[in-house]
């Protein structure tokens, strides 16, 4: 049987052929307690109940950076297998223009294809400098951008599904900066038990020092809109062997095992993606 081909419309071909920017231009919480009339039974049960300290502020206020008002959007696009190359070409033709246009308060942080994990998937990370007002300003302007609307129409024909989240960055991580390649990237996603985000952040604020010797720490984020109590840690490595050696080295450092001991019970589900950057990605 002949392989399926991704049919590219004339409109999409026009987008491909428009001038592209040069590569150099892209450069926590709740508390749970059980009480009983039987004081002895209550005391005994309290030994086994995981307590989380009550907080007076939202975890987004306590954990995010105070000196910036950056908001991030992460997009996951599941692409028809026969359309992945065309999807990448279309993306590389259009998205850099938004990144470079100063009229749009948004910038590309990274663009990847998933190598190990969900196949035929693209992941995009955007930064909105100015928080929610910047996001809304950008969205309103895009409604009147004919080229972007044409791009979305063509892109929709290539997708099986898509989803996104709005994120804030942890205060103890460095802000993601463009980096030269070649690198592979690992996106480790943790779905936490509700009410444990503060505890997660406190432990990682102490533990991040064990994971910075090879400059592998790129960024750390937690969800605000979309699926909640989700954490994303983004790492960069030269290759898979470097990843293994770097992670093994962390286990030889006193204190890293303690972080794992205290954070593992907070996790409901975790996932790892190994990703390859697209040509337009500022993170190479």
From Swiss-Prot:
Motif SIFI-degron: positions: 2-15
Modified residues (N6-acetyllysine): 65-66, 73, 80, 143, 146, 191, 193, 279
Keyword Acetylation part of the UniProt annotation: yes
Post-translational modification: In response to mitochondrial stress, the precursor protein is ubiquitinated by the SIFI complex in the cytoplasm before mitochondrial import, leading to its degradation. Within the SIFI complex, UBR4 initiates ubiquitin chain that are further elongated or branched by KCMF1.
Pfam families cross-referenced by the UniProt entry: NIPSNAP
Annotated organelle transit peptide span: 1-35
Keyword Membrane: no
Entry's localization field: Mitochondrion matrix
Family: Belongs to the NipSnap family.
Summary of the function given for this chain in its UniProt record: Protein involved in mitophagy by facilitating recruitment of the autophagy machinery required for clearance of damaged mitochondria. Accumulates on the mitochondria surface in response to mitochondrial depolarization and acts as a 'eat me' signal by recruiting proteins involved in selective autophagy, such as autophagy receptors (CALCOCO2/NDP52, NBR1, SQSTM1/p62, TAX1BP1 and WDFY3/ALFY) and ATG8 family proteins (MAP1LC3A, MAP1LC3B, MAP1LC3C, GABARAP, GABARAPL1 and GABARAPL2).
Assembly mode: Interacts with CALCOCO2/NDP52, NBR1, SQSTM1/p62, TAX1BP1 and WDFY3/ALFY. Interacts with ATG8 family proteins (MAP1LC3A, MAP1LC3B, MAP1LC3C, GABARAP, GABARAPL1 and GABARAPL2).
Name of the protein in its database record: Protein NipSnap homolog 1
Lineage of the species this protein comes from: Eukaryota, Metazoa, Chordata, Craniata, Vertebrata
Name of the encoding gene: Nipsnap1
């Amino acid at each position: 049987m002949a392989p399926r081909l991704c049919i590219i419309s004339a409109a999409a071909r026009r987008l491909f052929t428009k001038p592209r920017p040069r590569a150099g231009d892209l450069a926590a919480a709740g508390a749970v307690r059980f009480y009983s009339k039987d004081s002895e039974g209550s005391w005994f049960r309290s030994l086994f109940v995981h307590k989380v300290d009550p907080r007076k502020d939202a975890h987004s206020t306590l954990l995010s950076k105070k000196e910036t008002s950056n908001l991030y959007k992460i997009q996951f696009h599941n692409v028809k297998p026969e359309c992945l190359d065309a999807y990448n070409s279309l993306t590389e033709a259009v998205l850099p223009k938004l990144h470079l246009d100063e009229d749009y308060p948004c910038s590309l942080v990274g663009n990847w294809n998933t190598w190990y994990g969900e196949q035929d998937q693209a992941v995009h990370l955007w930064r909105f400098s100015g928080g929610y007002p910047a996001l809304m300003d950008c969205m309103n302007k895009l409604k009147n951008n004919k080229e972007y609307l044409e791009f979305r129409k063509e892109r929709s024909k290539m997708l099986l599904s898509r989803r996104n989240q709005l994120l804030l960055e942890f205060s103890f991580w460095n802000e993601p900066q463009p980096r030269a390649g070649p690198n592979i990237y690992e996106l480790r996603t943790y779905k936490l038990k509700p009410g444990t985000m503060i505890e997660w952040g406190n432990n990682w604020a102490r533990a991040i020092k064990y994971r910075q010797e090879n400059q592998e720490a790129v960024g750390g984020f937690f969800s605000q809109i979309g699926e909640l109590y989700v954490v994303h840690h983004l790492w960069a490595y030269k290759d898979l062997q470097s990843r293994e050696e770097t992670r093994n080295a962390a286990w030889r450092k006193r204190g890293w095992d303690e972080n794992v001991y205290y954070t593992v019970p907070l996790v409901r589900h975790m996932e790892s993606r190994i990703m390859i950057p697209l040509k337009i990605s500022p993170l190479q």
